[in-house]
Regions:
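Cell-wall glycan-active module
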Residues: 1-324
Length: 324
C-alpha cells in the first residue's frame, strides 16, 4: 500500500512513478503530498518534479507540485508561464528558497524558446541569487535547449555546470551529446559516469567506452573499455552492433524467429490491455489507444512483454490493420 507506513522505500516508488508521468495525475500528486507529509519524500524532490514539468510545458503538473510545498505561490505559476521575462523583472511575492525555485521555473520556461535570453537572465543577476543546485540546473536546461538546436555554444553552457550530480539523466544525456559534438571526451566520460541506471544502457555504455580510449588512455582504461564493449556487444540495437565491431566481431543478420504458435496468438488476443487499445483505435480514439498499447506492452509488467509476446502482439495489430 502507498498509504500509511507502507514499505520502507515507498517514498522512492512514489517519486519514481510521479517523475515518469508527463502529465498531471491527481492520484500520484496526492500520494506525493502524503509522502512529503510523512517525510518519505523531500521538498527538493517536489521542486525537481516542478522543474521537469516546466520544461515539458505542463503547467498543471507544475501547479500541482508547487501546491504541495508552497500552496500560497500557486497563483504565480500562471504568471511565470505567461511571461517569464515579465515575471523575472517584477517584484516577487515570495522569499527564500520558494522565490529562487519559482525564478528557476521562469528561466526554464524562457529557455524553451529563447535559451540565449535565459542565459542572459542567469548572467544578469539571477545566477548570483540561485543556490548551486538551482544554478547548475539552470545552465543545464539552457545547454539542452541550445544543443537541441545544434548550436555550437551548447557545450560552453554545459561547462558552467559545476556538479553533474545535481542533474537528472535526461539533462546529462544532452550534456553528453553536446560534448560529443564539441569533441570534449573528458566531459563525455564525466557526464555518463554521473548518470543513474541509465548509464548501463547500450548507448551510454558504448560512448563511455569510447571516451576511455580518447587521448592517451592508460592500460587500465583500455581494459575497462574493452570490458564495456564486450558487455554491450550484441545484435539487438545499433550501439550493441557498434560495440560488436569494436571487439573485432562481424555484425550478422539474426535468424528469423520461429512462426508463432496458435497458443501464442491466442494469448495475445486475450490480453485485456491489447484488446482495450485496439478497441479504442477502432473507435477513433487513436492517441488513447496507442497510449494503452504502449502501457500493455512496456509497462504493465516489469520489463515489459518478452520478445515472443511482442511478436504475437505485432501480429495481432497487423491482423487489425493497425500499423503504428
Amino acid at each position: 500500500s502507498l498509504k500509511g507506513q507502507g514499505a520502507p522505500n515507498v517514498g522512492q516508488q512514489v517519486r519514481d512513478l510521479w517523475y515518469a508521468q508527463r502529465d498531471a495525475d491527481d492520484g500520484c500528486t496526492l500520494a506525493a503530498g502524503e509522502m512529503v507529509a510523512q517525510k518519505k519524500m523531500t521538498e527538493d524532490e517536489v521542486w525537481r518534479r516542478a522543474r521537469q514539468s516546466a520544461e515539458a510545458n505542463r503547467q498543471k503538473a507544475v501547479r500541482d507540485a508547487v501546491a504541495i510545498v508552497a500552496p500560497e505561490a500557486v497563483g504565480q505559476v500562471a504568471e511565470l508561464f505567461a511571461s517569464p521575462a515579465k515575471y523575472l523583472a517584477g517584484q516577487s511575492k515570495s522569499r527564500g528558497k520558494e522565490r529562487k525555485e519559482l525564478a528557476l521555473l521562469a528561466i526554464i520556461r524562457m529557455a524553451s524558446s529563447a535559451p540565449e535570453a535565459a542565459a542572459g537572465q542567469i548572467e544578469g543577476g539571477w545566477g548570483a541569487q540561485l543556490s548551486s543546485d538551482e544554478l547548475n540546473w539552470a545552465w543545464a536546461v539552457v545547454g539542452k535547449q541550445t544543443a537541441f538546436k545544434l548550436q555550437p555554444e551548447a557545450n560552453s553552457y554545459f561547462s558552467k555546470v559545476r556538479r553533474d550530480a545535481d542533474l537528472n539523466d535526461d539533462l546529462l544525456g544532452w550534456k553528453v551529446r553536446a560534448a560529443l559534438r564539441a569533441g570534449d571526451w573528458k566531459a563525455v566520460r564525466k557526464s555518463i559516469e554521473a548518470m543513474g541506471p541509465e548509464r548501463n544502457e547500450s548507448t551510454w555504455a558504448y560512448w563511455r567506452a569510447k571516451s576511455m580510449l580518447a587521448g592517451r588512455p592508460s592500460a587500465e582504461d583500455r581494459a575497462e573499455a574493452r570490458q564495456l564493449f564486450e558487455d554491450t556487444a550484441g545484435t539487438g540495437s545499433f550501439y550493441e552492433q557498434l560495440a560488436l565491431e569494436e571487439i573485432g566481431q562481424r555484425v550478422t543478420v539474426p535468424p528469423a524467429p520461429a512462426p508463432l504458435s496458435a497458443q501464442e496468438k491466442a494469448t495475445a488476443r486475450s490480453n485485456p490491455g491489447l484488446t482495450r487499445a485496439l478497441y479504442a483505435i477502432n473507435a477513433g480514439l487513436r492517441s488513447e489507444g496507442v497510449r494503452e498499447w504502449n502501457y500493455a506492452t512496456n509497462l504493465h509488467q516489469a520489463g515489459g512483454l518478452g520478445d515472443r509476446e511482442l511478436l504475437a502482439a505485432a501480429d495481432l495489430a497487423c491482423q487489425q490493420q493497425v500499423w503504428d
